[in-house]
Amino acid sequence: MKVMKLKSCFWLIGLLLVCNVYAQELCRADFLPKASAAFDLLTQKYSEERIVKEIRAKNVRWVTNLMSASAVFYKATHEKRYLDMSEQVFGNAIREWKKNEKLMHGKDDFFALQNLALAYEILQDNDRLPMGADEVMIRFADLHFDPDFVIDNNQGQERALGFVRMCNLFPDAPGVSHWKEYVDKMWHFWYRNKDVDETATLYASIHLNDIINIAIESDKVALLKTPEIRRWFERYRDQQAPSGYMPEYGDDYFFAYNNWILVFEKMARLTGDASFRKAAWKLFTIGYPNLDIKYFKPGWNLRQACDWAALAEVALLPTFFEKSDSPVRTSLVTTRTNRKGKTDIPDQLLLRASSEAGTPFIMSDLYASGTHQHPNLRGTINYFEVDDNPLFHGVQRHATDVRHGNTVVLMKENGSGFPFDEKGSRLFTNSWFTDCVDFSQSTETVSYTHLRA
């Protein structure tokens, strides 16, 4: 009887351990319904008329992103309405661009080609391409081709990914040899250092995702399996706060969320290391309940809607079976390689006793160089959390001077620039900003009754 009870006890402990392991991995049922529901809310006011207006307003970046996002949601959910949306957006864009080439250019349209090519591929696989699409696709690519734009940041990698996809889709296009030459040049530019000179959280996730996609789609995955690139991946995993949040530094303010979940899941599959899956799970678990209303607000918000497609892409990744993981490091200074090839440069100071939730954590950007740098904030506290609550956090994009570091805003009594008025000037000078904290309800110290703590 005692033996049976002991066996039952071991069985129960084993079951609990297995459940705990699986609980720290994202499951499709956890995130895909939430992602598609959010996408639906944010595109609630979708109509063909609205799409045509967006195209004619030269909203190239988000029109192409919408056509690829809806196509990816179709692949993940098999819901025909997403394929219909992608086909309609793509078809209208092709027709309008064919009539007026000037509509092919818009703000931040370096994001456009890779999304356009992805939408084309999925529509082609489902026999949904309109007549004359090939000619417009090649013309679009040629109009956005700049062989001298070689840089190791998100703008460069987005362009490179677009031309990788165009080379695969149109191997006989007149300009394909030039496209391939550009793609090879872009790959070599960052691969010689096996690092990217980027210093902002969200932008780093964009170019990491692009580089992984480029490797997958141009048969270079084996080139990512080096010790240097493994350390590069781990650098971002180790930056994750114990709560699961990704601290923001450099020119950042977007709250890097869905894209990092996707990147961590891809890193897990490239390395076979389950710690990256745990990082994705932690970020989703802490992030989703705390997302701003803008991520769900019904209406028409293409930026936020398309952001959710990253989770739809997670659902399309190969099944991951590996359970072994490497430990997240505690207090350390991470290192990096810069664009000039200099190695072992101090990057981020990370202070924590463990990676368990609730542990106090501090991060300071020691590098503050490279793309999207905020050099005046070097050495300040970029992020500080206690009990999973961020107390110091990134202030705003383009908030670059020293006033924007080591600052906790407690109360805004005067809206005239205090201290970084949301819609006011970030260059407000010749004024000291002060405020007071009411400690009347706090505890008196024994030695100094006039002080409270």
Residue ranges: model-predicted function:
Residues 44, 48-232, 240, 252-253, ...:
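Aromatic-lined, polymer-binding surfaces characteristic
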Residues 2-10:
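Bacterial N-terminal signal peptides that target proteins for export
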Residues 40-42:
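N-terminal module of bacterial RNA polymerase sigma factors
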Residues 11-20:
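Bacterial N-terminal signal peptides
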Residues 219-223, 246, 392:
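Substrate-binding/catalytic groove segments of enzymes
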Residues 302-452:
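Catalytic and substrate-binding regions of extracellular carbohydrate-active enzymes
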Residues 24-38, 231-235, 249-353:
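Terminal, non-catalytic domain-edge segments
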